[in-house]
Amino acid sequence: SGISGTVFFWYAAVCMALPVIRSRNARNYIAIAALFVFGLTHAVFHLYLQPFQAGALLNGLLAGLVMVAGFIGLVGMRIMPFFTSKRLNIAQVASPMWVALSALVLPMLMAVLMMFQTALPLAGLLGIAAGLINLVQVFRWWHKDVVREPMLWVLFAGYFFTALGLLVTG
């Protein structure tokens, strides 16, 4: 399952890359890289299974979870302000490009450092930074009427706890 799972992620990266590159959709280039790194975390996790290095295995597992948090950050940065503005009929809160990229890039770098067990203090700082940036975004997007809309408050709760998870992991 280790090889097939890794191949799946890398094949998904290739399948996504073809139309994204063809259409020159630069905004989604980072998602292609993230799928590749997701496959890499999957492969390294399975490499640690064979000699059963428990500490390394845990780092590999956490690196994969950090990548999931990065994907949640990427998707959340795109949909939460949009859904909030449309559902509540308010102006959409814009996010600077560096903030939107940080939601995925910081966890992605953190995951790479964790899975190779190198520069772990830097990985921790990246997690703290990603968590704080995402928490700031939750408060920037917040509107008091979110609590009356189940679809919105579930999104906000999920994003909030994902940010806390990155903060605590860091």
Give residue ranges: language-model regions:
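Hydrophobic alpha-helical transmembrane segments of multi-pass integral membrane proteins
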Residues: 1-170
